[in-house]
Amino acid sequence: MIAEIISIGTELLHGDIVDTNSAYLAEKLTGCGIDVHYISTVGDNKQRLYKTLQQAVERADLIITTGGLGPTMDDLTREAISEITTCPLVMRPDLVIDIEGYFNHKRTTMTPNNLKQSYLPEGAIPINNPVGTAPGILLEKDNYIIISLPGVPREMKIMFEESVLPYIKKKNNLMIISKELHFIGIGESTLETKLEDIMDSMNPSLALLAGDGEVKLKITGKGRTKKKIENKISEIVKTVRNRVGEYIYGEDETSLPDEIGKLLSKRGVTIALAESCTGGLIGARITDIPGSSAYFKGGVIAYSNEVKINHLGVNKNTINKEGAVSPETAAEMASGVRQRLEADIGLSVTGIAGPEGGTDEKPVGLVYVGLAGIDGEVKTYKLNFKGDRNKNRWLTTQSAFYYLYRYLKFSFK
Amino acid sequence: MIAEIISIGTELLHGDIVDTNSAYLAEKLTGCGIDVHYISTVGDNKQRLYKTLQQAVERADLIITTGGLGPTMDDLTREAISEITTCPLVMRPDLVIDIEGYFNHKRTTMTPNNLKQSYLPEGAIPINNPVGTAPGILLEKDNYIIISLPGVPREMKIMFEESVLPYIKKKNNLMIISKELHFIGIGESTLETKLEDIMDSMNPSLALLAGDGEVKLKITGKGRTKKKIENKISEIVKTVRNRVGEYIYGEDETSLPDEIGKLLSKRGVTIALAESCTGGLIGARITDIPGSSAYFKGGVIAYSNEVKINHLGVNKNTINKEGAVSPETAAEMASGVRQRLEADIGLSVTGIAGPEGGTDEKPVGLVYVGLAGIDGEVKTYKLNFKGDRNKNRWLTTQSAFYYLYRYLKFSFK
């Protein structure tokens, strides 16, 4: 089955918003074994919308549109589909009731233009919209299927998951299964070299995705039976784990803070943070995880030297002699926060995020991470980043998590 | 001038990555007064890429492609342009030198396939790539211009800004100027009602963009002279400021932490944070701003009650009697951090982010913000959010910034 995705809305052609709907739909369709050949974006312009739809029904089996289903004059999707499919728009009394019900429930007044949304091309099946007024459209013709969803991502996604996905799965019985392996502490090119001989494998296929200071390997298999595809994927995973297993920190939907949370819970220990250049970002990422209060005590954002001295117990002489950005300060911060917040583990970072504050000796991007373990012993790590402020701060959190993860995973007695 | 944007790459059709390049280019082109009629995405497939390009040169004056310029066999953009324009590919000795130079500089070995990137369609001008090996292509034909840029956003953006934008501005002399007003403390629909009579204005046009707990108004004017457009925009801005000026916190590229930073600097005062449910996210956002060390002392991430008591001086009885999520605790947290970190202002948040931890009396989404002013007086604010954990945490930071901003702007003596 060949699919085409069409995003409708002038705001997309102005670049006011990024079209995330298409990537979402493309991923879901690919996951069902459907080949997406084209993604098109077109504005709220009658003529160009017709042309784009006409072309799509000629070259694809399944056309999914998003946007242009609202009640205003700009919303042209309904009319365009009616025209292209030669199915006249007819009012659906059941939809009138739904739309009136929606406004009653919200206790707001319905304006007459909302009734436009109760018209569908003849023969179309309305797709229920549990979170808005615009119903979707599903229309089967001899050679193609058109599905129209609203442009608001939240509405589109709920309707796709609840109604469209089950329908498509029935129509198309080729299955695609993917598995993701998450790596930390190894670069994309090194990984590619180590896996060179299997990277070209066709089924399952392998793809490396790098970004945000880590690398993912996506393994995708196609077939008719789940069992067979999963077996093929397992074989690849086994090969990869044999070669570079020590750099894999997780599979599928996960993140470093997620895996660290699991390890801390499993070992029944708590952690506290002392953050300088990250200003709270490590804490924000740790507490992103629901239930993190079980192992996260809290932290000190020690942005000024006073706070480092008064609230973490860093020695004034250490800062004067070695500087606030030094392994010695990082070590005292980690020890200090561990003791003062009565945690089992203390993690600290101090560095120069930029753009100001760098010197020849201590350039922008220099960062020290301190890790005080459960026995009180402290290790420090030196890092040199080359990014801008944002990137340096993010990579600092990634590195801190990396050392913490390895400590919890491998060095913990 | 009518433009079309084409994104090339199978990874886009799989939904592995979201196409942010097109929105970036669309915004820049719109800003130059160029109408973008279509955005298309096509995979690394010869036949479909040719068709898409052929169609584009027939209906647009300016075609910008991204992706498919790399050295591998999958990269087909160069060949496709050569075919469509009937300009044969010729090797450019100057580009060979550039590419060899790039590898020498990086001290890595050049593989022969990299030389593919030294071939350009005859008559094309290479676009310098300061951060990678793939040069871009600029080819002027009688009826259209094709510009090809790499798909890596960082490379694409630098090349667009440095080389393409100046070229396009010369070619097209209609000007578009935009101004953005940032609102906080007023909802999209209220704002729309208050501006109803001017929302339909054509030139300048007005658009409301809501998201992330705030609303933006984008005012866009078109014309031939800068002065005239700016005057028209100024009139609209004046009208808007007269009606809803108190909710405007900034113009154009800015953010709440940015404006708060400016106010703190201007007034020469410092701030400290006591964060519970946000776990460091407020600090992370404040320290996103370069130079924030001038006014940000630091903070305490008081995730556990122990930390609230021992490191912020919250009274144990307050927590036992009123609970950790209460106006009383928020007030003591704000006072405590202000005193202990010797800051002029203390800002605190405590709440239930979810998904667990809610009760009938104190449901998920209940948050208290505490603000201890320069005179030591404390105010607290109650909030009820209805989102998931992520959204509740983000909206908590937005609200805390809102109260802080209003304090600094209006109540400060």
Swiss-Prot record, chains A, B:
Put simply, this protein is called Putative competence-damage inducible protein
CDD domains, per database record: cinA
**Which top-level group of life is the source organism from?**
Bacteria
Q: Which PANTHER family match?
A: NICOTINAMIDE-NUCLEOTIDE AMIDOHYDROLASE PNCC, NMN AMIDOHYDROLASE-LIKE PROTEIN YFAY
Give each disulfide bond as a residue pair.
none
Q: Which NCBIfam families match?
A: cinA_nterm (TIGR00200), molyb_syn (TIGR00177), PncC_domain (TIGR00199), PRK00549.1 (NF001813)
> Where does the record place a coiled coil?
none
Q: Which residues cross the membrane?
A: none
Q: Which family is this sequence assigned to?
A: Belongs to the CinA family.
Q: What is the lineage of its organism?
A: Bacteria, Bacillati, Bacillota, Clostridia, Halanaerobiales
